[in-house]
């Protein structure tokens, strides 16, 4: 256990990306740009040990995955989809009916095409499809494309079922940096898209960073993280599994628990130690707990909030007797979960907001994915002659001050 000042003195995050990967990513992207599908099939064999004669999964296969899914899983995915859809519809920016006198305003248009990366790796993630494709669908994106790493037994049936529910247009079994390059450049089979979203490993994150500017991206994601503020009213057994739930994602997952009561933190520490040997996914959880788990003793409310805002975690959870004051004070987090019945895991699946959230302290300046990230926003300026005449002198004078005389002339010629 550390006191708040000790923690803050040593707190740092590793660079979110391993710079040594840069040459590898560059070479992969160039290979895909030049050789297209041939390169993708080669990388599937090299990295995923899977031979793929056909990169695209047919609509018949996608529908069959949904049709043959067990009813309980189907209902769970459907409920998640409905809640996500309803929430995103409620926050979607829309074009407003304007009075004729309004001369400056904004209009919104959906992106034309979006690529979604759905991780394979250590687990199957249909929730990633729901938390991304639903948003694109609500926005009105015309072409939604999913890429996901090939598996020896084929792409997860749950992932394909989620693609069916969200009306994804195309699904391709290709992953890693090569899939990001394919979505950026386009290949014989995979269409070029305008924006790529979705979480992935370091190769995926670095490819998104490398290709940003040629394609839009949501974020460059690092390891997942949660920070909790608790007091003596928190259910410590539940907190143990809030910690384990985050830790099981990745050996590098970070978990922080902040509290003003040192004894509560000690009790939690002993419960974690007792439960750890028998936890599912022990190999992953134990490494995360050993290397990336912190108990932090804060001296008061303000200090607890300061620690939370400094961490700026992807997920923040407040489980105290009176959580309301924290809602205003905790400012820099990806998502804020309040109370015993709002565990972070509910946000992973069915709460409604997307679980694609900023990591590595980027919550200090960016936000979680939403329907509005799949819209362009255009300003429209349509001035009357009267308004032009009221402001033209200022415009032409500023142009003169900046020595941009053709700018100035563009105004003057309209005044004459």
UniProtKB/Swiss-Prot annotation:
Cofactor note: Binds 1 zinc ion per subunit.
Keywords of the record: Amino-acid biosynthesis, Histidine biosynthesis, Metal-binding, NAD, Oxidoreductase, Zinc
This protein's record includes keyword Metal-binding: yes
Cofactor(s) required, per the database record: Zn(2+)
Residues that coordinate or bind NAD(+): 117, 178, 201
GO cellular component, as recorded: cytosol
InterPro entries the record matches: Ald_DH/histidinol_DH, Histidinol_DH_CS, Histidinol_DH_monofunct, Hstdl_DH
Coiled coil: none
Secretion signal span: none
GO terms of molecular function: histidinol dehydrogenase activity; NAD binding; zinc ion binding
Reactions the enzyme catalyzes: L-histidinol + 2 NAD(+) + H2O = L-histidine + 2 NADH + 3 H(+)
Binding site for Zn(2+): 246, 249, 348, 407
Binding site for substrate: 224, 246, 249, 315, 348, 402, 407
Function: Catalyzes the sequential NAD-dependent oxidations of L-histidinol to L-histidinaldehyde and then to L-histidine.
Name of the molecule in the record: Histidinol dehydrogenase
Lineage: Bacteria, Bacillati, Bacillota, Bacilli, Bacillales
Encoding gene per record: hisD
């Amino acid at each position: 256990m550390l006191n708040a000042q000790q923690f803050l003195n040593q707190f740092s995050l590793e660079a979110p990306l391993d710079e040594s990967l840069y040459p590898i990513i560059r070479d992969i992207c160039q290979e895909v740009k030049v050789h297209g599908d041939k390169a993708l099939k080669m990388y599937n064999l090299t990295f995923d040990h899977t031979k793929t004669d056909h990169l695209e999964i047919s609509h018949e296969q996608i529908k069959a995955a949904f049709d043959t899914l067990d009813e309980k899983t189907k209902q769970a995915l459907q409920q998640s989809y409905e809640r996500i859809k309803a929430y995103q519809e409620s926050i979607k920016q829309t074009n407003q009916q304007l009075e004729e006198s309004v001369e400056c305003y904004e209009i919104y248009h959906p992106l034309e095409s979006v690529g979604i990366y759905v991780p394979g790796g250590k687990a199957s993630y249909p929730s990633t499809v729901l938390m991304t494709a639903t948003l694109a669908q609500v926005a009105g994106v015309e072409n939604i494309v999913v890429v996901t790493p090939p598996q020896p037994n084929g792409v997860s049936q749950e992932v394909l079922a989620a693609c069916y529910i969200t009306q994804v247009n195309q699904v391709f079994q290709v992953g890693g940096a090569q899939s990001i390059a394919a979505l950026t450049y386009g290949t014989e089979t995979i269409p070029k898209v305008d924006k790529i979203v979705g979480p992935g490993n370091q190769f995926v994150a670095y490819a998104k960073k490398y290709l940003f500017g040629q394609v839009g991206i949501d974020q460059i994601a690092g390891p997942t993280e949660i920070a909790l503020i608790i007091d003596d009213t928190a259910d410590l057994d539940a907190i143990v599994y809030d910690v384990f739930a985050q830790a099981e994602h990745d050996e590098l997952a970070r978990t922080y628990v902040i509290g003003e009561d040192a004894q509560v933190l000690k009790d939690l520490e002993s419960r974690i130690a007792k439960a750890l040997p028998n936890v599912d996914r022990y190999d992953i959880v134990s490494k995360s707990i050993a290397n990336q788990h912190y108990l932090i003793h804060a001296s008061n409310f303000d200090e607890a909030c300061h620690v939370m805002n400094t961490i700026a975690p992807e997920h923040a959870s407040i489980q105290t007797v009176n959580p309301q004051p924290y809602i205003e004070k905790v400012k820099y987090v990806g998502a804020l979960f309040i109370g015993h019945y709002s565990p972070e895991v509910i946000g992973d699946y069915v709460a409604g907001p997307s679980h694609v959230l900023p990591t590595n302290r980027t919550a200090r300046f960016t936000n979680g994915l939403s329907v509005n990230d799949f819209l362009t926003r255009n300003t429209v300026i349509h001035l009357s002659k009267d308004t032009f005449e009221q402001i033209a002198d200022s415009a032409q004078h500023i142009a003169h001050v900046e020595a941009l005389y053709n700018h100035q002339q563009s105004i003057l010629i309209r005044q004459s």
